[in-house]
Amino acid sequence: MGYNIPRGTQDILPGESDRWQFVEQIMRDTCRTYQYKEIRTPIFEHTELFARGVGESTDIVQKEMYTFEDRKGRSLTLRPEGTAAAVRAFNENKLFANPVQPTKLYYVGPMFRYERPQTGRYRQFYQFGIEAIGSKDPAIDAEVMALAMSIYEKAGLENVKLVINSLGDQDSRKSYREALVKHFEPRIEEFCSDCQSRLHTNPLRILDCKKDRDHELMKSAPSILTYLNEESAAYFEKVKQYLNDLGISYEIDPNLVRGLDYYNHTAFEIMSNAEGFGAITTLAGGGRYDGLVEQIGGPEAPGIGFAMSIERLLAAIDAEKRELPVDKGIDCYIVTLGEKAKDYSVSLVYKLREAGISSEIDYENKKMKGQFKTADRLKARFIAILGEDELAQNKINVKDAQTGEQIEVALDEFIHVMKANQKG
């Protein structure tokens, strides 16, 4: 019997994986210039980490986690997001003791949520994320957003926008929660069951509801910005000032709260405006999470970060009809004629590869015409032709597939010639 992949997952096949590697390299190169270092955490963690870190009342914890028991009855969960695990690693490995702070981390890898699969949303999905832990400076907030926007710019995207908000400190949110309850309570029965249950547990999450987003009460909800105390308002003003100084355009959305419980002060999303991108326009999202480090067992250490969907980045590139510079083809394909030439080509192609020259030979015993077709399909820049006559004369014919020019080269000079003409 045949097998299919589980619903909500995908195979990333050769060709497409080149595009993934290209954008991932943009992410890694950008992190290097901003001095963020890679961290690799386990794909599964103790369930309690996400319950405490992400929030008991969130959709992620309530409905979407892949949780299982190991053979000793311990509850483990496939990671649904990256921040909680990064903070756990920060605490457990005492990264807070490093003399240079903040600790700047990035990660790339699969996450898992049991959601309804749709375009741009999978049950196994890939995220790139960064965390800056150990500083409560508005400048680091601006840096984090600048880094994200820089990645989209380097990927060639033009139709993106940064949307920001402030959730304020604990006192500001307390005042705002009271105002939200007062606003929603008279007609809360008109909302979905999830929003009704959140009214007195976490009313800010009502603003993040996808089902009721267009409800008139949602549109007329009070703005959190009017409930910021002096300190929180000043912090937000400083963040905006730095973004202005960096020349980064942004919009303010007072209903932007994000879907995780640990956010405070700065919250932001980056969205695609590309025509035909689809219903899910959010490319990345993040914010400040002061208090999370202490909440999961560490010292006082404020932090900020974001997560970026790699699938949605590639979808946005397609929506804007951008071509990534991948699939350049190989440097050289060796066409052989005769058994002795084939035997010699096995060691010759090995030497080419060891010299850093991408190259290939025939493994299907094709005739010469078939080998030339394979070279064409592989987009070989040079086609080296080796028969038994050439081998006896210690020579090889080299054809430039772009110009059609063909030259004869001594075998002991062949690798040097290929190296000199290698693709950039």
Swiss-Prot record:
<comment type="similarity">
    <text>Belongs to the class-II aminoacyl-tRNA synthetase family.</text>
</comment>
<dbReference type="InterPro" id="IPR004154">
    <property type="entry name" value="Anticodon-bd"/>
</dbReference>
<dbReference type="Pfam" id="PF13393">
    <property type="entry name" value="tRNA-synt_His"/>
</dbReference>
<keyword id="KW-0547">Nucleotide-binding</keyword>
<dbReference type="GO" id="GO:0005737">
    <property type="term" value="C:cytoplasm"/>
</dbReference>
<dbReference type="InterPro" id="IPR006195">
    <property type="entry name" value="aa-tRNA-synth_II"/>
</dbReference>
<dbReference type="GO" id="GO:0016740">
    <property type="term" value="F:transferase activity"/>
</dbReference>
<dbReference type="GO" id="GO:0004821">
    <property type="term" value="F:histidine-tRNA ligase activity"/>
</dbReference>
<dbReference type="GO" id="GO:0005524">
    <property type="term" value="F:ATP binding"/>
</dbReference>
<dbReference type="GO" id="GO:0006427">
    <property type="term" value="P:histidyl-tRNA aminoacylation"/>
</dbReference>
<dbReference type="InterPro" id="IPR033656">
    <property type="entry name" value="HisRS_anticodon"/>
</dbReference>
<keyword id="KW-0963">Cytoplasm</keyword>
<comment type="subunit">
    <text>Homodimer.</text>
</comment>
<keyword id="KW-0030">Aminoacyl-tRNA synthetase</keyword>
<keyword id="KW-0648">Protein biosynthesis</keyword>
<protein>
    <recommendedName>
        <fullName>Histidine--tRNA ligase</fullName>
        <ecNumber>6.1.1.21</ecNumber>
    </recommendedName>
</protein>
<dbReference type="InterPro" id="IPR045864">
    <property type="entry name" value="aa-tRNA-synth_II/BPL/LPL"/>
</dbReference>
<keyword id="KW-0436">Ligase</keyword>
<keyword id="KW-0067">ATP-binding</keyword>
<dbReference type="InterPro" id="IPR015807">
    <property type="entry name" value="His-tRNA-ligase"/>
</dbReference>
<dbReference type="InterPro" id="IPR004516">
    <property type="entry name" value="HisRS/HisZ"/>
</dbReference>
<dbReference type="Pfam" id="PF03129">
    <property type="entry name" value="HGTP_anticodon"/>
</dbReference>
<dbReference type="GO" id="GO:0140096">
    <property type="term" value="F:catalytic activity, acting on a protein"/>
</dbReference>
<dbReference type="InterPro" id="IPR036621">
    <property type="entry name" value="Anticodon-bd_dom_sf"/>
</dbReference>
<dbReference type="InterPro" id="IPR041715">
    <property type="entry name" value="HisRS-like_core"/>
</dbReference>
